[in-house]
């Protein structure tokens, strides 16, 4: 995870201070990239403890095509609470776009099912892309997608994934995003008979909120520990068939959690 820590240090010391939508203020840079070889360990931060249950439940929630926080609340995950309406709805956010993208003609496309089939049948395709940025739906979303487009790539029996993230909350959000897409890559590789390759994380506006500076300094003062291992315990027919108990994380020995406020 040295690439993440180097980026955290770069933004903290070289970033440009800017006003932002939330009113908190940020220090940001534009256009950065990190690479993680999933064969070298699961990229979950060890310089602070992350809540792996929340990351996994959120990913399974996306893959269900769900956009109501009911499932998350049932599983004690609160990361979307601030954006949901009184009924728990968020509008046509990630899960809706992944599983039920609505075209101009009214037809819907299950992008996850499509890309899984393409990986199996046409692995050299350059069109192994899933997008959550449906321009017509953006005004209806409680929060437009931050991690908005990902592409798979098959080579040498390994499945790699590149994510483009337009807005990257470096202290709170990005560590979740790294782990989530590393999980998704591992899961997709498992069901398509491949091994996990690289996760490539491309960031647009990468920023630290002004009320995260002290927390970032504390994290940078800590020595990284060995990465954990992510195990998939069961074979399933499709990536959308996975359940929470199908996974196991071993040898995760992080430093203590660092609390920081969420900018809404």
Curated annotation (Swiss-Prot):
Signal peptide: none annotated. SUPFAM superfamilies: Thymidylate synthase/dCMP hydroxymethylase. (6R)-5,10-methylene-5,6,7,8-tetrahydrofolate binds at residues 51, 169, 263. One of its GO terms (molecular function) is thymidylate synthase activity. Disulfide bonds: none annotated. The active site is at residue 146. Pathway: Pyrimidine metabolism; dTTP biosynthesis. DUMP binds at residues 21, 126-127, 166-169, 177, 207-209. It holds the Pfam family Thymidylat_synt. It catalyses: dUMP + (6R)-5,10-methylene-5,6,7,8-tetrahydrofolate = 7,8-dihydrofolate + dTMP. Keywords: Cytoplasm, Methyltransferase, Nucleotide biosynthesis, Transferase. One of its GO terms (cellular component) is cytosol. One of its GO terms (biological process) is methylation. Catalyzes the reductive methylation of 2'-deoxyuridine-5'-monophosphate (dUMP) to 2'-deoxythymidine-5'-monophosphate (dTMP) while utilizing 5,10-methylenetetrahydrofolate (mTHF) as the methyl donor and reductant in the reaction, yielding dihydrofolate (DHF) as a by-product. This enzymatic reaction provides an intracellular de novo source of dTMP, an essential precursor for DNA biosynthesis. Homodimer. Belongs to the thymidylate synthase family. Bacterial-type ThyA subfamily. This is Thymidylate synthase. The lineage of its organism: Bacteria, Pseudomonadati, Planctomycetota, Planctomycetia, Pirellulales.
